[in-house]
Amino acid sequence: MPALREGLCAGALLATLGCLQPPPAAQGESTPPGDDADDAVLLAARGPGQLYAIGEVRGFELRQGGQRIGSSWGRYVGMDERGHHRFETRIELTFPGRAPARSSGELLLDGDGHLVEGFERSAAAELRFRRDGDSVVFTDGAQTDEVAYEPGRRPTAFMAHSAILHAELMFGLQGIVGREPAWRLISLSGGAPVEWSARVVERTPGNHHLRVQTSLGELVTLVDGRIAGIEVAATELSIVTIAAPTWPAFTIEAPRVLRWSRPADANFDVRELELPGPPDEPALAGELLIPKGAAGPVPAVLFVSGTGLEDRYGFAGPPPVDLGSHEITDALAQNGFAVLRFDDRGRGRSAPGPVGFLAQVDDAGRALATLAVQPEVDPDRIIVIAHGEGGLRGLLLATKRAGDVHALALLAVPGRPYEQVMRAQAEARIEALPPEIRERARAQQRTMLDDLVSGRAVPEELAPQAQWLREVFAVKPADLVGRVRVPMLLAQGDKDFEIDPVADVRALERAAKARGASLEVRRYPGLDHLFKPEPGASSPERYMVDRRVDDAFITDLLAWARRVTSPSPKPRRSRG
């Protein structure tokens, strides 16, 4: 469930328990004294009610490069009426210049320490899980997944992202038998299970003090069975206990659920559509907005969404964000246009599939072909309206399928090569960091992006992003805009932090002029990347604030669409 994993770990810039890191090379290990038998009990397993006093709080501070980057708390609440043991966690990760990222969790265990149910919640997403026979079922309310869970057949632990109490529970419930314990580790944050193992590299007589090197790269210090510290050399991460911790006051509300409802004065009908495609490609779903009372075929719009995965309404996330495209498409339908809007693969009712840039171009082509054969649509008056990076897909459609696209509207579209855009975005974020950590952050960012683009040292779970980047980096927007031979509109807000309102517009404008392409440019002071009013500085956090798409922008877009789709006297082409 990659969307859930993204949401629950959103903004986490550290690697800790539950987030995989390659183990560092083992050097200078001390040899544990005493009995090295494989069945020697170095830490006795105990039941969940024997590990903590009711209400006891455990607190941990997370540091990276010697600086505090967050805290993790956990506590034992006691037994409920069903005899299940309840544990709670709170996580707070801090980032310079940004609000803290907070999450909460709850865990119910039976008397044997086996998982019963629980949840992990952040402002981005809520993931609930429960044991069902030999499986753990995860759901975010829209998607459901399950992983095998058979603790009676093989030792199995469970852990949520940055929940250090869960790590302490893991050692307390499983115990340590022999120098190399091993068990299966289930992520409660939506990640894939992993095989976990460790080596006891140091211990004192009586095993009151143990140091354990794990296969995930952590060096864990246990004192009387409790975590006293964790070190991750590869990321300069350290975790230390907080003396006399108190339970944090913050709470996390369940994230909002975004839903579209037809406007009360809607003058259009809605018809569900499937977008036909090759049998080996995922099924795609969308809907056609059909103006009521239209006399004969009407002009039509295909809306192409921007970066990231969105549903047909422009709802993205986690965290749940209303990007506002439904306001644009509703207005077009309300004013006489048939509109096709569709779910990106893996969103809404569209099936998941590999998310490469070229695959997304093909998906837009499927939508265009589907729109053209609808009986209410005039195939000679189809325009494509594309937002953000979706504009690159729109440009490719307009050049490769010139006969099918009558006009093209580019809303906040990059004009420079996308690699330049991404690196500029990263540099802007780095400049907001404290001066003492900028160079390290800049080097880490450069290495990460270089590795993704080249395919070097790319974790399996990031392979799709690497493919997408390689494909989109090959696109030259300025070259494409010069080859388009239909009317184009370029709209740009001057509060956009994703696209440079000057450099990107200039690149497209100059290329169109040099090649004789028809490009009308409209600039909108005070509007952000989503064409919503922004009184201050735009940021990802500001996208979470409920705002409407600007009325004047929508009015201009409607006027342009009417003008470029005015009926022409040329013969109508056959649908065959």
Task: Kindly give the residue locations of the regions a language model identified.
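Solvent-exposed helix/loop surface patches that form functional interfaces
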Residues: 36-42, 46, 51-57, 124-213
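N-terminal cap/lid segment of alpha/beta-hydrolase-fold proteins
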Residues: 255-296
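Short, surface-exposed "cap/lid" segments of acyl-processing enzymes
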Residues: 293-331
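Alpha/beta-hydrolase active-site loop
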Residues: 324, 354-375
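Accessory cap/linker subdomain of secreted extracellular hydrolases
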Residues: 401, 407-483, 498
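Short beta-strand/loop motif that positions the catalytic acidic residue
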Residues: 484, 490-492
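Conserved alpha/beta-hydrolase "acid-adjacent" motif
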Residues: 497-504
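Catalytic active-site module of serine/aspartate enzymes centered on a nucleophile-bearing elbow/loop
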Residues: 530, 536-575
